[in-house]
Amino acid sequence: MDLEALKSIFEGFDLAAFLPELDSIVGWAEMLMRIFVMAGPLLLLGYGIMYLVSPPKEANYSLGYRFFWSMSSLHAWTFTHRLVGVVWTVLGLALTVVMAVYCNAFRRMEIMDAMNTAIGCIVWQLGLILAACLVCNIVIVICFDRHGFFRFGDEEE
């Protein structure tokens, strides 16, 4: 076997061409982290505005914020969607601003630090959303009985 012939075959071969561009992979990872971090607050803001502007008209099992007390009467249903609309809009707006600041900082971080920060942001978002839903449910239970009647007097729409 001729060694010179073998060298001539691999003369134009560049091993580095097979390796991915790490800058491109880091760029894709950063973009995906931004999407994952911003998706929750933007969806929360969108649903909050939708519940304020155009809530579902009747209690149903397919659309709307479903909770046993809120589905008992039309008054409880509209009250629930107004309350949830306000809470989700405010929380969505606040989280959008805060998460945009964090997403802006991803470029200055190392990739693993940015990933850990993104995971922390998503966990905080989920915790705040669950707390907001819990508070809304408690307010609904306090304001309405299980049959959908307002507990504090005779409030009309």
Question: What do these predicted regions represent?
Answer:
Residues 45-64, 135-146:
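Membrane-water interface of transmembrane alpha-helices
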